């Protein structure tokens, strides 16, 4: 039996869909469906059962799943970088993850979890080393703290964390303001033909802030590779290894539609000092672990994503 936490979320639902494509339907989907619109992410997927995240963790603690799970893909978390309720974030992200880690180690269950590139904060290098980890918000701190906790454990089975960079693609629509710029730029072009980007900051020209934008399909492939290689444990960056600008994303959306232009807006004061103007995954450790898959560029993946978006109709749109 396979567990995917955050199964109705962005990366989790893409994982479930790909597991289905591999012939695996024996999946327990774990999530919090307070936002009922997230059910659309699972509506075309095959699962064996659904459990609320609180019920699942109670059953884990009660021993209901002892020696019954093959792998846990732990994608569930509060992923808002603007959430500052530290007590909530620690309980939801850090403590929950610790419980699943200890269960996995005690029950010979592979544990593959979502970390985040946000742990690097304002660092200019993105290598899986403690001295480069400088979280700028409580979400990033919760992810950083769990990575640190994992590093201190004497592991008996596979534990692999993936530091996701800027993931974009199908099934992210429920994230609202936290959805990718590709999603928002597409909506903006459809609404009034204008992509709105931040003006320059931190020495970058308008729209030239750089991020490692990685397609969700490629992120799923790394997760599945780890599952298929249970001897691989560690914390790994998960991005393309090549930063691209926000202008690149906007231009890919404009090129797809054959219309539109870019408009630059003032950089918000509230984000100053808490914003990553540059991220680029160093993939040295992931490659050394044996992963050989390629990652799509913005120019390759954005048209695929927009093709998918054209086929969708979301509640409220």
UniProtKB/Swiss-Prot annotation:
* Transmembrane parts of this sequence: none
Q: What is known of its domains?
A: Contains a large N-terminal NADP-binding domain, and a smaller C-terminal substrate-binding domain.
- The identity of this protein, by name, is ADP-L-glycero-D-manno-heptose-6-epimerase
Which CDD domains does the UniProt entry name for this protein? Answer: ADP_GME_SDR_e (cd05248)
Q: What organism is this sequence from? A: Shewanella frigidimarina (strain NCIMB 400)
| Gene Ontology MF terms | ADP-glyceromanno-heptose 6-epimerase activity; NADP binding
GO biological process entries: ADP-L-glycero-beta-D-manno-heptose biosynthetic process; carbohydrate metabolic process
What quaternary structure, including any partners, is listed in this protein's UniProt entry?
A: Homopentamer.
Catalytic site: 139, 175
């Amino acid at each position: 039996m396979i567990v995917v936490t955050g199964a109705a979320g962005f990366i989790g639902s893409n994982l479930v869909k790909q597991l289905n494509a591999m012939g695996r339907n024996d999946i327990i989907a774990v999530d919090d469906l307070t936002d009922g619109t997230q059910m659309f992410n699972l509506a075309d997927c095959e699962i064996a059962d659904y459990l609320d995240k609180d019920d699942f963790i109670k059953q884990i603690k009660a021993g209901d799943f002892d020696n019954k799970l093959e792998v846990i893909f732990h994608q569930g978390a509060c992923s808002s970088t603007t959430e500052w309720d530290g007590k909530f974030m620690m309980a939801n992200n850090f403590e929950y993850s610790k419980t699943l880690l200890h269960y996995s180690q005690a029950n010979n269950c592979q544990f593959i979890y979502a970390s985040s590139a946000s742990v690097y904060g304002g660092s200019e290098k993105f290598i899986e080393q403690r001295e480069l980890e400088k979280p700028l918000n409580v979400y990033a701190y919760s992810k950083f703290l769990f990575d640190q906790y994992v590093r201190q454990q004497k592991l008996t089975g596979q534990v692999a964390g993936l530091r996701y960079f800027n993931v974009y693609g199908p099934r992210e629509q429920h994230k609202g303001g936290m959805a990718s710029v590709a999603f928002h730029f597409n909506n903006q072009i459809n609404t009034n033909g204008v992509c709105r980007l931040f003006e320059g900051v931190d020495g970058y020209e308008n729209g030239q802030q750089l991020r490692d934008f990685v397609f969700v399909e490629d992120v799923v492939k790394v997760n599945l590779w780890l599952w298929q290689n249970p001897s691989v444990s560690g914390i790994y960056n998960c991005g393309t290894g090549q930063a691209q600008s926000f202008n690149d994303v906007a231009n890919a959306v404009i090129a797809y539609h054959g219309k539109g232009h870019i408009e630059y807006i003032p950089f918000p004061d509230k984000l100053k000092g808490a914003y990553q103007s540059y991220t680029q995954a160093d993939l040295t450790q992931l490659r050394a672990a044996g992963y050989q898959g390629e990652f799509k560029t913005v120019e390759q993946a954005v048209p695929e994503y927009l093709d998918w978006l054209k086929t969708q109709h979301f509640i409220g749109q």
